[in-house]
Amino acid sequence: STIRDLDRQITTLFNRLPCKPLGFPVGRAPSLATIISEIGDIQRYPTLKKFLSHLGWCPQSFQTGNYRLEHPKMSHAGNKYVRRLIWMLSIFAVQRIPRYREYFQRRVSEGKAKMHILVAVGRKLLSALYAILKKGIPYDPNWEENSRLALARR
C-alpha cells in the first residue's frame, strides 16, 4: 500500500543520514526521521535547554506582577505532531523498557502525577537523542548511570 511504500522510502533516506541515532531504545526509522527532520542541524542548539524549547518539550512560565502560575503548563511551541510523537514514544518506553517502567512506578509511588512522569520520561529520551546527535556516538543504555559516576568523580 501507499503508506508502506512511504515508510520504506523514509527508512531508505533515514539510513543515508550521516549521523543517525543508532540503537535508540524507542521508535523506528519513520518516527525518528520525523523528529530529526523537525530538528534540522543539531548544531543550531548550543544547549539541551534550547533543543527542548524548540521542540516545545518544556514548561511555560506565566508571571504578571506578583502573580505566578502555581503549576506551569507545557509549552505549545514547536510542531504539535512531533510533540505528540514524543508523547507516544514516552508511553512506549514506560510500557516496554524496564528502566523507564521502574522509574515510572517509583515516581507514581512517590505521589507524582502520571502525566508529569511521562513528560519527564520524554525529557530523558530527548536528552539521550540530543547527546547522540550532538556527539555522534551510538546510544548507551547506561548513560545516566555513567554520567552520574563521572560527575561524582569531579
Question: What residues fall within each predicted segment?
Answer:
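A detector of single, family-specific signature residues
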Residues: 1-154
